[in-house]
């Protein structure tokens, strides 16, 4: 209380010391009575704390439809998710669904549906989803290479030698303008499912070997080869580092964890 009065002491006359004593009692009573009035304002945020869950509801996990609305190409993203997930789901639960309709030729119908879904996934990813979601596309083309196959001895017509025609298989990678905006939701879903599907097929292939399902293993080999082809092609096509950084991060973490587990000197 003394420090508070020193700030206002020069404003009061020096010849009236009793007024200070009187004011001391008044101010002390005022401060003591004013404290209860100020305490509700201090404790008022504590009373309002039950309203915080209402404000935290905006931070709840968003649903799939809400994320699709934030996508730049929601229809393309929806078809991409469908074609990437449906072959694996059909492989696991397809026979159960087919048995609900017919019990004849179950394996043949299941195999045909799987082939159609894998082919549709390969075409959609290669031609539509990669171009719209991340601005990448690749294709394969065959070029003609002409090479002279002569021995250097000319003939009467002046021809030096015959030209041999050969064909070369060329991979063409196309990347969009680096200044183009890539939606982060589209990019994350694209790269996650691009690398996640081959891993799922490998796991299912191991299970097929353990169950001695060699016909299904043949299909899994085809599906894995198509999925790995798309994964490697889009990784090479991405020359601006969107996939390379993601793949390098995953591979370095996996290699580091394996090295730490098998390193006898690190323990």
Swiss-Prot record:
Annotated Low complexity bias = 26-38
Record's compositionally biased regions (Polar residues): 39-59
Q: Name one GO cellular component term.
A: Golgi membrane
Q: Which InterPro entries match?
A: TVP23-like
Going by the UniProt record, its keywords in alphabetical order are: Glycoprotein, Golgi apparatus, Membrane, Transmembrane, Transmembrane helix
User: What is any one GO biological process for this UniProt entry?
Assistant: protein secretion
Transmembrane segments in this chain: where? Answer: 78-98, 105-125, 189-208, 212-234
Question: Quick check: keyword Lipoprotein in the entry?
Answer: no
> In what way does this protein cross or attach to the membrane?
Multi-pass membrane protein
Q: What does this protein do?
A: Golgi membrane protein involved in vesicular trafficking.
Protein's name in the database: Golgi apparatus membrane protein TVP23
This protein's species is Candida albicans (strain SC5314 / ATCC MYA-2876) (Yeast)
- Supply the gene name: TVP23
